[in-house]
From Swiss-Prot:
Subcellular location: Cytoplasm
Record keywords, A-Z: Cytoplasm, Magnesium, Metal-binding, Nucleotidyltransferase, RNA-binding, Transferase
Pfam families in UniProt: KH_1 (PF00013), PNPase (PF03726), RNase_PH (PF01138), RNase_PH_C (PF03725), S1 (PF00575)
Positions annotated to bind Mg(2+): 496, 502
Enzyme Commission code(s) on record: 2.7.7.8
Name the record gives this protein: Polyribonucleotide nucleotidyltransferase
Cofactor list: Mg(2+)
Catalyzed reaction equations: RNA(n+1) + phosphate = RNA(n) + a ribonucleoside 5'-diphosphate
CDD domains: KH-I_PNPase, RNase_PH_PNPase_1, RNase_PH_PNPase_2, S1_PNPase
A GO MF label: 3'-5'-RNA exonuclease activity
Organism listed in the record: Desulforamulus reducens (strain ATCC BAA-1160 / DSM 100696 / MI-1)
Length: 740
């Protein structure tokens, strides 16, 4: 790489300028590109190891590194530096990984690492899109053998018009968030969240995005061409194909294909379960292994690879040509479905969803508004009321593995199921709860993420959450053989492993709420998309029907074990009265009632308590603390002090040892007749009726017993009649003395 030359090129993307630069930073990486999009800046590097590894998979790692200095923040906590990647960072890394992985040579075993370091963030220009384009460019100018570059965009739709890479204000009004990545001739990856958008319109969005992707791919191709001429790009390294002895290959494939075909057809005819099929197929495969190792003892690795190649070829050919599946189902048939709700006694809502040998237990928990998740990363600061977490324990597949914290796959599956239900969650004004759903994959044979969507819907409805509409999901598969393809509905584990696509579609009866597509081939066409979406719609409607047979609408009441939330509003100026000095009053209120109390800046108050009576008590206390005495209103108040000039009456009692609201009944307002001594009319501790008649210049409350009696019809007759108008008082003058 040249030490002195720098290549900078730009393209218009979504009405803003995107710039690629190489030759200035990170020159020791195999490929490095600095991407600038608006004021978003991401450095993307691609590095390849010199030596191959003795493994049976391609070791690709994509790391998306968020730096808080990118938005002018210092990390919180004691350490004051970035720690583990956030959930957003993990999802962004997966977003880059998925479209590029199928474009590497099938037999590549050199480790490749792509690192996207987010250095500056402008909220209107998504750093994950800049990182995806940068990863493609960095790989393409390097010696790493990516078959062809990719491009990626976000497609939104505002007022019926598609928008490329919508800005924050546009995204707020968009009914879809569709990430499309692909090459110049095919779509490689789709990730979407939507507000019940019909399949046909989602497809148009995908195709619209792909047209812009083609422009980005051409831009990266031209960037590499210029970089080659400047010594800033390199020729691709060669990855040799594994070579087999032709005699050995022919002997193994001929016999193995026939034996495996008979075994697969037997499994299909008998409709064996996953475990039964695994036992049966293991016997067949082990028998073939032993037979060929006796014949070719010096090539154990090659023997295994050829037998696996035969299995993949046979299973795929049976699906595409015979239209048979290994479990005996039709191409568009869904496995048997079982639905249960209310499974666990003390939880707020549960749904047990079983589809074939995939089983998900989803549990919904309702909490107070204060329990919502605060998202404090590189994006716009916001909070999340609905959370979905997905767990995949090893026993779900009958395996033993260490139990660790959630990995990238679990985080990705959880986010997909969360996205599918998010548009259906009622707003805070309708249902003022924080909601968390945990989906436990307790049995797995494919499509646990879509099972989690179904389980989540059931658990939320069981918890009494008034969803806008129930949601279900189904995973579609694809077998592409030469010029023909077969789309499979509700794929299981083996079909996912041996197939070319995992296309997950979730939504309501009205439209799609989430999409995710992963493929293992260099892209798919519009025709494949159309058929997959059409089959997915039919499958989703079938699954929804099964779910609604068990629970057709959300329960009318939330669980008795869930906190009841009481809402009220106070004047914002009264918030300090509830909080008290140093939070003293609010703490005492929580301790006394056991309720969870949240006060918003605009004066909205949410009281959450499992014990409904304690919640009501907390409401009464808050109303008492914030109550204002209304002028002109009658009150029954307790006489707290008696003085020579009147008495003080508490018209709103104090609570929790706090003083109540009291005012002065002047001695002239105690009775209609003249009062010489206050004690002649009232005694301390006595409860009397008074009327609030106003405030003095110091803001002190003035009360009247006399006016209260008048309003109650207890005034003397003469005092109730209209009084004659008073004559003007003349100055007193003594008559002059006269002389006699």
């Amino acid at each position: 790489m040249s030490e002195n030359q720098v290549l900078i090129r730009e393209i218009s993307l979504g009405g803003r300028t995107l710039t690629l630069e190489t030759g200035r930073m990170a020159k020791q990486a195999s490929g490095a590109v600095l991407v600038t999009y608006g004021e978003t800046v991401v450095l993307v590097t691609a590095t390849v190891a010199k030596n191959t590894r003795d493994i049976d998979f391609f070791p690709l790692t994509v790391d998306y590194e968020e730096r808080l200095y990118a938005v002018g923040k210092i990390p919180g906590g004691f350490i004051k530096r970035e720690g583990r990647p956030s959930e957003k960072a993990i999802l962004s890394g997966r977003l880059i990984d998925r479209p590029i992985r199928p474009l590497f040579p099938k037999h590549m075993r050199n480790e490749v690492q792509v690192v996207a370091t987010v250095m500056s963030v402008d909220q209107d220009n998504a750093p994950e899109i800049a990182a995806m384009i940068g990863a493609s460019a960095a790989l393409h100018i390097s010696k790493i053998p990516l078959k062809k570059p990719i491009g990626g965009v976000i497609v939104g739709r505002v007022d019926g018009q598609f928008v490329i890479n919508p800005m924050v204000r546009q995204a707020e009004n968009s009914d879809m968030h569709l990430v499309v990545a692909g090459t110049d001739d095919a779509v490689m990856m789709v990730e979407a969240g939507a507000k019940e958008v019909p399949e046909s319109e989602m497809l148009e969005g995908i195709m619209y995005g792909h047209e812009k992707v083609k422009e980005i791919v051409k831009f990266i191709e031209d960037f590499r061409t210029e970089a080659l001429g400047m010594g800033l790009a390199f020729e691709k390294m060669e990855i040799p194909e594994p070579q087999f002895d032709s005699n050995m290959s022919e002997a193994i494939l001929t016999i193995a294909e026939e034996a495996i075909r008979e075994a697969v057809l037997h499994c299909s005819r008998e409709k064996l379960t996953k475990k039964q099929r695994e036992v049966y197929m293991d016997e067949v495969m082990s028998g073939l292994q032993e037979k060929f190792l006796e014949q070719f003892p010096e090539n154990p690795k090659e023997v295994t690879m050829l037998i696996e190649k035969a299995e993949k070829k046979v299973v795929r050919r049976i699906i595409t040509h015979d239209k048979l599946r290994i479990d005996g189902r039709a191409i568009d048939e869904i496995r048997p479905i079982s639905v249960e709700v209310g499974v666990l006694p003390r939880t707020h809502g549960t749904g047990l969803f079983t589809r074939g040998q995939t089983q998900i237990l989803s549990v919904a928990t309702l909490g107070s508004i204060s329990e919502e998740q605060i998202l404090d990363g590189l994006g716009v600061e916001e909070s999340k009321r609905y959370m979905h977490h997905y767990n995949f324990p090893p026993f779900s597949t009958g395996e033993t593995k260490p139990m660790r914290s959630p990995g990238r796959r679990e985080i990705g599956h959880g986010a997909l199921a969360e996205r599918a239900l998010e548009p259906m969650i009622p707003p805070e004004e309708v249902f003022p709860y924080t909601i968390r759903v945990v989906s436990e994959a307790i049995e797995s044979n494919g499509s646990t993420s879509m099972g989690s969507v179904c389980g989540s819907t059931l658990s939320l409805m069981d918890a009494g959450v008034p969803l806008k509409a129930p949601v279900a999901g189904v995973a579609m598969g694809l077998i592409m053989e030469e010029d023909q393809f077969t789309v499979l509905t509700d794929i299981q584990g083996l079909e996912d492993h041996l197939g070319d696509m995992d296309f997950k579609v979730a939504g309501s009866a009205n439209g799609v709420t989430a999409l995710q597509m992963d493929i293992k081939i260099p892209g798919i066409t519009r025709e494949v998309f159309e058929q997959a979406l059409e089959q997915a719609h039919r499958g989703r409607m079938f699954i929804l029907g099964k779910m609604l047979e068990v629970l057709s609408t959300p329960r009318a009441e939330i669980s008795v074990h869930a906190p009841a939330i009481i809402r009220t509003s106070i004047h914002p100026d009264k918030i300090r009265d509830i909080i008290g000095p140093g939070g003293k009053i609010i703490k005492k209120l929580v301790e006394e009632t056991g309720a969870d109390i949240d006060i918003e800046d605009d004066g909205r108050v949410f009281i959450a308590a499992v014990d409904r009576e304690k919640g009501k008590r907390a409401l009464e206390i808050i109303q008492s603390i914030t109550a204002e005495v209304q002028v002109g209103k009658l009150y029954n108040g307790k006489v707290t002090r008696v003085t020579d000039f009147g008495c003080f009456v508490e018209v709103i009692p104090g609570v929790m040892g706090l003083p109540g609201k009291e005012g002065l009944v002047h001695i002239s307002q105690l009775a209609f007749q003249r009062v010489e001594k206050t004690e002649d009319i009232v005694k301390e501790g006595e409860v009397i009726a008074v009327k609030a008649i106003g405030y003095d210049q110091q803001g002190r409350l003035k009360l009247s017993k006399k006016e209260a009696m008048r309003d109650m019809g207890l005034a003397p007759a003469e005092s109730t009649s209209e009084q004659p108008e008073k004559r003007e008082r003349r100055p007193f003058s003594r008559p002059k003395a006269t002389k006699e």
